[in-house]
Structure formats: structure tokens, C-alpha cells
Amino acid sequence: MSSPSKRREMDMMKLMMSDYKVETINDGMQEFYVEFNGPKDSLYQGGVWKIRVELPDAYPYKSPSVGFITKIYHPNVDELSGSVCLDVINQTWSPMFDLVNVFETFLPQLLLYPNPSDPLNGEAAALMMRDRPAYEQRVKEYCEKYAKPGEGSEDKSSDEELSEEEYGSDNEDDDDDDVAIAGKPDP
């Protein structure tokens, strides 16, 4: 067994033995989901996100690919794909880091300290810089709608969109049961 594959297995086992819920895809160690809780003292506290992680063949010498499956409102996360703009993972990754670092350090730092000057979600970045209270309210709305603990995050995919009513309406008569699910036909 080569060194990168041994390291991949060791890092996966370390992650699985931590407090994170890990679900492998296709019974392999190359792709998996991790349940990630929003960091304390952040706008995301109390939210739970499903994160997809893909390990390249050259892991740990090449960084893992990380993306939010559960929809999140953040300047550095693409709202449609869930892709994360995270320099530490994408550009400054080192083989000294492991998978637990991604979930205990890198993602919490991203959520605690968004960078609106290097956005993947331009609308979130603009709102954050222009109207901080409105931005914070939108983050909380997304957390309440999509990142509730204990609910199936498959129904809250990053490529799902809010309807016009859900996105910006003050109409309290809206029926929240009519949530569109990405990849499924409308009834």
C-alpha cells in the first residue's frame, strides 16, 4: 500500500473516531459526507450542514475538495454549487494538515470571518458590506430554513433556490411546505 493511501485511511479513521458523523459514498474512502455544526458565537451557531469531501489521488499532498450540500448564505460559498472559496484548502494546503483540521479549524474560521472582498456569492458579499443587519438576518433565515439539526439535509440542497415569496416577502401567509427540491420534478 502506498504512503498516500495509508495516510488517507489514517485520516479517515481519525475523522470517523472524532465527534463528526461521516457517511462514505460508494463504500470508498475517496468521497464522503460529513455533518458539520456551525461554530459557537457565529451567525451559523445552531445550524447543521452536510459537507461533501472528495480526496484526490495525491492526498495528502493535494488538498481535499470541500463543498456544502446543505444550502448556506455566505460570501465565500457559491450558492448554487456549494463550492467553498477557502485559500487554506485550495492554495495553502500542506500535507501536515489532516481532515479533522478542515472541520475543526478551516471551516469554522471561514464561517466566523467571511471575506467579502473575494466572493463566490457576490450578492451575499455586497449585502454584507452594504447592510450588515440585513446580511445577518439573511444568514439566520437560511440557517433556520435549511440547516436545522436532525432534519434530512438532502431536501435542502445547495442548488435549491428560494422562491420569490420565501426570498424577500413579508407575507406571513406563505405556505412553507411548498419547498422545491433540486433534481426532482414539480408536483
Swiss-Prot record:
One of its GO terms (biological process) is ubiquitin-dependent protein catabolic process. InterPro entries: UBQ-conjugat_E2_core (IPR000608), UBQ-conjugating_AS (IPR023313), UBQ-conjugating_enzyme/RWD (IPR016135). Gene3D superfamilies: Ubiquitin Conjugating Enzyme. Residues 145-156 have a biased composition (Basic and acidic residues). Expressed in antipodal cells of developing seeds and in the vascular junction between the cotyledons or leaves and the hypocotyl. Not expressed in pollen. SMART domains: UBCc (SM00212). The keyword Transmembrane helix does not apply. Residues 145-187 are annotated as: Disordered. Pathway: Protein modification; protein ubiquitination. It catalyses: S-ubiquitinyl-[E1 ubiquitin-activating enzyme]-L-cysteine + [E2 ubiquitin-conjugating enzyme]-L-cysteine = [E1 ubiquitin-activating enzyme]-L-cysteine + S-ubiquitinyl-[E2 ubiquitin-conjugating enzyme]-L-cysteine. PANTHER family: UBIQUITIN-CONJUGATING ENZYME E2. Belongs to the ubiquitin-conjugating enzyme family. Accepts the ubiquitin from the E1 complex and catalyzes its covalent attachment to other proteins. This is Ubiquitin-conjugating enzyme E2 4.
